[in-house]
Amino acid sequence: MKTISIFFVIILMSSSHAEDDVLCLKGFKSSLKDPSNQLNTWSFPNSSSSICKLTGVSCWNAKENRILSLQLQSMQLSGQIPESLKLCRSLQSLDLSFNDFSGLIPSQICSWLPYLVTLDLSGNKLSGSIPSQIVDCKFLNSLALNQNKLTGSIPSELTRLNRLQRLSLADNDLSGSIPSELSHYGEDGFRGNGGLCGKPLSNCGSFNGKNLTIIVTAGVIGAVGSLCVGFGMFWWFFIRDRRKMNNYGYGAGKCKDDSDWIGLLRSHKLVQVTLFQKPIVKIKLVDLIEATNGFDSGNIVVSSRSGVSYKADLPDGSTLEVKRLSSCCELSEKQFRSEINKLGQIRHPNLVPLLGFCVVEDEILLVYKHMANGTLYSQLQQWDIDWPTRVRVAVGAARGLAWLHHGCQPLYMHQYISSNVILLDEDFDARVIDYGLGKLVSSQDSKDSSFSNGKFGYVAPEYSSTMVASLSGDVYGFGIVLLEIVTGQKPVLINNGEEGFKESLVEWVSKHLSNGRSKDAIDRRIFGKGYDDEIMQVLRIACSCVVSRPKERPLMIQVYESLKNLGDQHGFFSEYSDEFPLIFNKQEHLK
């Protein structure tokens, strides 16, 4: 009923404001710095120009220029929050998170945008106090101001936001006591503010002169005794830390102790799982433990370089996938939360969405949506999937990876590409997982000789000398995936009974091509069924991806376009529209 009432009010007042919304965006763009040209699609030939398909803009409907939502996160925009927003009167959701906005939060923001339901200004450089006038956003459900430079106390007026379900003020410079009515938002909503006290953080204390004298005296006596004990314990901690390399918490480096990691999780079973979208029912760590049968080996979906994934069947009938990262996180807690929040906002039809995470000491669990048909690797090795389905998978996976390289903001290298990170949903559409994890985990595996010498089969040959991941390295890995699709073979250690040799897939295919026996390299389950010309086209695309010189490999977007032409012949992907607005003048810049 509340949603209907908001909608009804906006409909009544909005018919005359379509031109105002155009002026709103024009003013917004002109008042900001946009160094990476994220808003280059924002052009306004006249006051009636359609704005509903501009980057980050969503409208109530496509036929009128009334803005429902502005989603402009992670675009490197800088400047103060523009006053022109007051012309977007129908706006319900404003997300300017993880940019470089500075200055004060406008005290008039809720009189400008009275129908806001979601306001996310997190991850900027905003300063000053939280305006008490935010109480005028009477429909506000979610308020995120974390990771800024806000000072002062938390205004008591926030307690009057009756619809507020999510509040995050963490990682600022706020001080004073937390209003008791806000304590139910949990510690995560307030941590990282050294001057804050009160539930759910530590209690606020007040000391008179007598109490202070007692505390200081006791502190001095205790300090002398502690110094003696501490000096003796120093050596024990020093030796232990050299052995374990700081194996607690964030920033841990080399730290995993696999002896009883499940026991560690059980001892923290009441820890809440952080979810990026507000759930109907909150999930705790114990729910994941039970849903995976105690992380039983029978629930393993796939084991990859980034970690082991487990199928989690929840009591309500829904299914998730829980990944335990194999390496520790070298980031600080603030850096980790910044990176994980960015990953949690990424949505694309060919990517597996990251739904949430849970951290217990050095253990990091990631929660993803479950894909019904498993991995591409398992499908190729265990089942007979026909050629049209393989084309569908190849195009979808290429689309997802190309979007990470050329359409996502910020851009992402994958670094873990393989047929085990390409999952298949119930319609056999490809969904890429494990993107962005290279920024979270220890770089130890990139220094491991078995990684650099190509043992895993997907690692580009130049990595053995440069030790630096690159976009062209992702293209090489995807080329191996295409070879798997065409040949049905594994990426490494092929054992051909007839000729008795073991080689990498690239070497095996190259030998067949150089001997004029390309047909012998094709999977017999798909050869001779009317698609041989298409199969050879994909083989040529694959070979272009795995050339030894990185600069001679195509861009991922070029690989996608080549494969999409094949998909169009099968009528699979006519609904795909242009989603790569960036223009690249120098291919070398991307490699």
Curated annotation (Swiss-Prot):
**Which residues belong to any copy of the Protein kinase domain?**
295-573
Q: Does the keyword Glycoprotein apply?
A: yes
- Tell me the residue numbers annotated for binding ATP: V301, V302, S303, S304, R305, S306, G307, V308, S309, K323
Any one Gene Ontology MF annotation carried by this entry is: ATP binding
Tell me the residue ranges located in the Cytoplasmic compartment per UniProt. Answer: 240-591
Q: Repeat LRR: residue ranges?
A: 66-88, 90-111, 115-137, 139-162, 163-185
Extracellular topological intervals: 19-218
Q: Which Gene Ontology cellular-component terms appear in the entry?
A: membrane
Top-level class of the enzyme under EC nomenclature: transferase
Similarity field: Belongs to the protein kinase superfamily. Ser/Thr protein kinase family.
What protein name applies here?
A: Probable LRR receptor-like serine/threonine-protein kinase At1g69990
